[in-house]
Amino acid sequence: MGMIPDLETQKPYLDTNVGVGGYWNLPLTCYWLAQIHSALENQSVDGQACFPLVGTNGARNGEDVLRFLLAGASAVEMASAVLSDGTQVLSAAIKRVEDYLQSRDTQVSQLIGKAAKVKKFADMPNQEKPWKQFVQR
C-alpha cells in the first residue's frame, strides 16, 4: 500500500503501487549528490549551503550515511532500510556515525561534500574495464 498527497485536494491518494529504492542506487546517488553539491557550492551564504541536499536511495547503515554526507548530503533518509529491517537500523546508524566522528575528532558539518571536492570523474585515470568482456559488441 502506498500514499501520495494530492496537491489539489491536499488529501492522501492511496494505491497499491509502491516503488522502493535500495542499496543498488548508492553509487549513482552519491555521484549525483557530488555533482549537485559542487554545482551549488558557489551559491552559499556565510559558508553555509543555500540548498541543503538530502541523500536518498541506498542508505542501509551508518557507513552509507557517512558516504552520503561525504558526497554532499546534509541529511540522509533510510526508508528502505527501515521497511526491510525495522527501526533499529536508525539507532545503529546513528551510533556508527557518532563513533566515526569521535574516532576522527571531527563533526558532521566538516564531512558534508568533502569527497565531492577531492576529484572529478574527468580527473580520474582511465581504468581497465574487465566487465566489458561480458557485454555484447
Indicate residue ranges for each PLM-predicted region.
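Electropositive phosphate-/nucleotide-binding environments in soluble metabolic enzymes
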Residues: 23-30, 87, 91, 105
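Glycine-rich beta-to-alpha transition loops that act as phosphate-gripper elements at the mouths
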Residues: 46-63
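Glycine-rich phosphate-binding active-site loops on the catalytic face of alpha/beta enzymes
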Residues: 1-2, 58-59, 64-92
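Hydrophobic faces of well-ordered beta-strands that scaffold small-molecule active sites
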Residues: 36, 52-57, 76-78, 107
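Glycine/Thr-rich beta-alpha phosphate-binding loop at enzyme active sites
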Residues: 1-46
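Generic structural signal for well-ordered alpha-helices
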Residues: 30-37, 65, 90-94
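Extended, intrinsically disordered, low-complexity segments
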Residues: 26, 43, 95-137
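Glycine- and other small-residue-rich loops at beta-strand/loop junctions that grip anionic moieties
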Residues: 21-25, 54-58, 79-81
